[in-house]
């Protein structure tokens, strides 16, 4: 009798565990299906853009809905690179990117080195003030910056997209570089001071070479933010004499009412290159 009583609870527990496993498996399957559906929904617009970029004009503007081209037209991408408007805009973008790829990591690590490895009066107060700028939405500073750049004569040029970045490119990069530099042993500075190295020499020969990981991170972020930036050129642009960037040229080609639908495949190809 006692063995039978022991067997029944064990059987119930086993049945409960099997049911729990089945419910858990069903839940996981449902979650995976849901995530796949969400992923497909998110990827579909980009896949459609790539598909449209490989179509002929007739396939795009035709009455019949076509999702994929009969014969991929890779020549559409060559037409983008042969278009003078896109080509000059691409050159302007590369100039902005190369300038900022050099200026932002150097200036951010240089400023961060002062906060992390040097001693001067009011350092913590100044650093806290700098961090407080991170709480300001970018739109709050647009009107003051517009007025300032107008006074300098920078509007309708690429200067607003480059020169301000020699101050670190934003408090977040300085904060990250400072945190990285603070993690380095202080003995390195002490040894350099004994050898007679000043702050500048310690930065260029010790701090900067050791900052390679954070520099790579900053450069990746600088590249992606500048490559896809059309908001900045949109603000500082006054007329058609502005040296358009590639992202703005693509944006303008989709919003300009004077551009016909017969070039939609070329514009889609430009959008793929920009993305």
Predicted stretch roles:
Residues 27-275:
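A structural signal for multi-pass alpha-helical bundles of membrane permease subunits
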Residues 1-36:
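Transmembrane alpha-helical segments of polytopic membrane transport and secretion proteins
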